[in-house]
Amino acid sequence: MEVIQYPNSPFKLHQPFPPAGDQPTAIAGLLEGLSDGLAYQTLLGVTGSGKTYTMANVIAQSGRPAIIMAHNKTLAAQLYAEMREFFPENAVEYFVSYYDYYQPEAYVPSRDLFIEKDSAINEHIEQMRLSATKNLMTRNDVIIVATVSAIYGIGDPTEYQQMVLSVKEGDTIEQRDIIATLVSMQYERGDLDFKRGSFRVRGDVIDVYPAESSENALRISLFDDEIDRLDMFDPLSGSLIQRVGRYTVFPSSHYVTPRDTVLRACESIKEELRERIEFFAREQRPVEQQRIEQRTRFDLEMLYEMGFCKGIENYSRHFSGKKEGEPPPTLMDYLPDNAIMFIDESHVTVTQIGGMYKGDASRKQNLVDYGFRLPSARDNRPLKFHEFEKVMPQTIFVSATPAKYEEEHAGQVVEQVVRPTGLVDPQIIIRPVATQVDDLMSEINDRIEKGERVLVTTLTKRMAEQLTDYYSELGIKVRYLHSDIDTVERVEIIRDLRLGLFDVLVGINLLREGLDIPEVSLVAILDADKEGFLRSHRSLIQTIGRAARNVNGVAILYADKITDSMKAAIDETERRREKQIKFNEEQGIVPQQIKKQVKDIIDGVYHEEDGSKGRLKGKNKVKVGEIHNEEDAIKEIAKLEKAMQQAARDLQFEEAAVLRDRIRDIKENLLFGAE
């Protein structure tokens, strides 16, 4: 492993091997585009060509902070794990939604049903979010891996920075002033329960457990009114780690606000409330008039007394001082001016970013219309797409199949078609639809004999289920991947396929970007000639690419005619194959099969979340004694949580509460080391 630091770059790249294939030219091309000031570029990188490694090299050589956007938590976790391996000495951060479970506030007029906001916050993810913003403000060697959570409103960066507590050995400051500052930063005093986001006082010593810290706490030792020494210590064992000359404690929430800002916001909220009460009075809607007055006055009382209230984000416009309709502050406002943005799998992510605002707006409108929220609540929202475009730094779109937006905006397209391993795109074979099930059966048997795996994609859920049942009856080990399966279970199914616990995976939308299964040597696309979203040329290229990580990779398209989408996908795949084969011949490269260790792609990130990804009916409860280890506990929690969410959706709140308590028992007794 070679460690490389380029001139004027704060990044130390741990390079397992030098760039190969198309990587060197792609890296040089992207760096040239950045230095030429191109606002948008596209990295057209085929499956398995090492796009993440190329991104890491561009970041290391440019020396600029970076944000990498992904379209789901699984892909973000995969990128985060890889970037941490490339940059273990730099600040690689993870910024995704910190909700394990989130039921937004909503009102259903037809049933006169108001649904209170309910959520379960994952403390580990919250700590990582706070760590991300802290490092953006204090370091220049930062890489943030984020989902669309980055375009949702968080606290204003200017006010967030005003609320820090900076301490230095030798400073003169009274103990009560330190305590008052910590309380205003929403730290809790916890002399008995010392946890993240709390502090405790013992004589002249104040221990602070910073909200963004995953393992170390700060000890402030005072002598009279002077800071005598500062030490970092292990909050679990109490052992000292190192003495520090100075330290900056950041707020325990992104929504912390100075007292004068809170008071100013309260006056502004009162004014809006008065206008809203008058509006409902004119409209002769006494129920809504009473509702908005009662709810808002309660929130105002909490703000005056505590400085925050439940649902404080709905008043964010009053706190930030922005005008109606102006974009809220987001993570994008924390980025330094010289940052670079990578949008991974941009053909999906760009569309996803564009769709976030409208879904949020329609729900908020009902709350406003029926007096549950003031109209300013509509400004607590994700960015609209044109607002996102305005705050985008220099951007590199990364995709094997760039969409129309990238094609229209990219100043240049850099191709990364040749893989470092010498693997070429799979050979495409077209066969008739009439015999597709039986023909595929014989192909599957061939692959099973060789110890290889098969992906089968169908058009409908019914077809997928019938095919799975049919092959299963014939003795083939087959599983069906469908939309009801949550993120963690999906990762487990893919891991089981790689381990050979079953040989065939059937699904409807198996083009899932980032699906990395080197053992798959055959991708079968049934009814490939039916035009539509699942059989568009981009979907076909993505699906065919799932076999590109295997030296014997083949894609069989079952079709009676060649559609425009099929032709485009076949032509593009053949173009890439020709280029790859030619390069291999010129360089004397023999394609090498990828041998990739089977492990959880989300090591270090998702195990914290495993305990909150799915739920099981109360009647299926398992006694604590039947759970023997942490792995059993995690699986049991996953089942219980799936059932809890379903019970909540079915309005079976008593059952949901029982399941919630059961989950808490397992976590306390097993996951956190009961005696």
Swiss-Prot record:
Keyword Metal-binding assigned to the entry: answer is no
Helicase ATP-binding domain segment(s): 32-417
Positions bound to ATP: 45-52
- Keyword Acyltransferase in the entry? The reply is no
GO cellular component terms, semicolon-separated: cytoplasm; excinuclease repair complex
Localization, per the record, is: Cytoplasm
Keywords attached to this entry: ATP-binding, Cytoplasm, DNA damage, DNA excision, DNA repair, Excision nuclease, Nucleotide-binding, SOS response
- Provide a Gene Ontology MF annotation, just one: DNA binding
**GO terms, biological process:** nucleotide-excision repair, DNA damage recognition; SOS response
Which segments constitute the UVR domain?
Answer: 634-669
Give the InterPro entries listed for this entry: Helicase/UvrB_N (IPR006935), Helicase_ATP-bd (IPR014001), Helicase_C-like (IPR001650), P-loop_NTPase (IPR027417), UVR_dom (IPR001943), UVR_dom_sf (IPR036876), UvrB (IPR004807), UvrB_inter (IPR041471)
SMART domains recorded: DEXDc, HELICc
Motif Beta-hairpin: where in chain = 98-121
Where would I find the Helicase C-terminal domain in this sequence?
436-602
Organism domain of life:
Bacteria
What family does the database annotate?
Belongs to the UvrB family.
Q: What does the entry's domain section say?
A: The beta-hairpin motif is involved in DNA binding.
Q: How does it assemble?
A: Forms a heterotetramer with UvrA during the search for lesions. Interacts with UvrC in an incision complex.
Function according to Swiss-Prot or TrEMBL: The UvrABC repair system catalyzes the recognition and processing of DNA lesions. A damage recognition complex composed of 2 UvrA and 2 UvrB subunits scans DNA for abnormalities. Upon binding of the UvrA(2)B(2) complex to a putative damaged site, the DNA wraps around one UvrB monomer. DNA wrap is dependent on ATP binding by UvrB and probably causes local melting of the DNA helix, facilitating insertion of UvrB beta-hairpin between the DNA strands. Then UvrB probes one DNA strand for the presence of a lesion.
The protein, known as: UvrABC system protein B
Task: Give the taxonomic lineage as stored in the record.
Answer: Bacteria, Pseudomonadati, Pseudomonadota, Betaproteobacteria, Neisseriales
Q: Which gene encodes it?
A: uvrB
